[in-house]
């Protein structure tokens, strides 16, 4: 089992969710985050003054999936979230040692 964590642009959430649902991914966690990558933010003009915006609003999506699905999940996220512009985001994959569904006590893949 793996956790696939993606940092994406907020307006891409629905497309990413639809792509994951089409793969049979039933649950995901979405967190509003701020950050920057290679672009290191940008500047904005407000009332004639220029301001540096260092941290950009993003969404962090986390999904727990069977190891066999990781490649398909990554492809689905990239396809749905990609704009071709700076700041499209990143995807990270980490192992899950164990998973437990609190309500039923199901473990590991049965819990997903």
Question: Across the structure, where does each feature detected by a protein language model lie?
Answer:
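Positively charged, small/polar-rich N-terminal and surface patches that mediate targeting and assembly
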Residues: 1-112
